[in-house]
UniProtKB/Swiss-Prot annotation:
GO terms for molecular function: ATP binding; phosphoribosylamine-glycine ligase activity; phosphoribosylformylglycinamidine cyclo-ligase activity. The keyword Nuclease does not apply. The lineage of its organism: Bacteria, Bacillati, Bacillota, Bacilli, Bacillales. This is Phosphoribosylformylglycinamidine cyclo-ligase. It is an enzyme of class 6 (ligase). Pathway: Purine metabolism; IMP biosynthesis via de novo pathway; 5-amino-1-(5-phospho-D-ribosyl)imidazole from N(2)-formyl-N(1)-(5-phospho-D-ribosyl)glycinamide: step 2/2.
Amino acid sequence: MAKAYKQAGVDIEAGYQAVALMKEHVQKTMRPEVLGGIGGFGGLFDLSALGYRQPVLISGTDGVGTKLKLAFLLDRHDTIGIDCVAMCVNDIIVQGAEPLFFLDYIACGKAVPEKIAAIVKGVADGCVEAGCALIGGETAEMPGMYDEDEYDLAGFAVGVAEKERLITGETIQAGDALVGLPSSGLHSNGYSLVRRIVFEQAKLSLDEIYEPLDVPLGEELLKPTRIYAKLLRSVRERFTIKGMAHITGGGLIENIPRMLPPGIGARIQLGSWPILPIFDFLREKGSLEEEEMFSVFNMGIGLVLAVSPETAAPLVEWLSERGEPAYIIGEVAKGAGVSFAGGGRA
């Protein structure tokens, strides 16, 4: 079957095998609103079953970036899909969305069924964590575009919010508090710089455990991006959140202003949260200035919530009681941009 196509580098049978292997992973993500199964031309989702009065759909798309290069080097592909889901889902939940469904796109040089299934397993694990269904996707074998052992991964998330429950940041004002939720590590940003530091400047091994890390460097760098969807759902049932920012590329400096009204900025108190060891490690090995660290990496904060001053302490206490660390990391201030004060360590 398709002998000439296979000779040209596209193995249709391998694609069929990959689909068969991924089915069990996809199935565990299903929600009652999903109509039909995988294999159709499009994924179907019954929005009316949710009972929203004025539903607003919120969508996002993203990839994993050059973190994929580390997955290639370590030949580990079962968690990178979690990163893909996290990058998309975290972007829509900060606007008030309940994640509904997800689609993935994998482009590769050679379709190895077991590898594709491992990637999709990670995507499915991320979807379960986010509470959304994996209702479709595309795996494209593209010889000549990618090396045989390389691939790219992107995703698309769609969520819904009641119109009156959208989080727009419009009510944020000077004096409001900024509460930070910890990241799990680097998440999925800054990896071009990370690879330059690790491989070109410091010439490190991914298999070694370096001080102050407690796992091999490769394992630390591949830690999946944290997904905040279920936690935020619980938070919003009890507290009023004025605005939220997903701390991705550009760090606190670039992402906090995205949730703020015009003419309003933020003052961050350094030392108000613990900096994860991986950031100190990279700063030392790369001889980086603190300003650049904060403009590239999340520095241990994956999500920032803007709340009224009287809400901040009860929110942090409530989270702490449930084993979820959170920190009051600063406040909203007049004037544009993000400034830093203080120092030391939390």
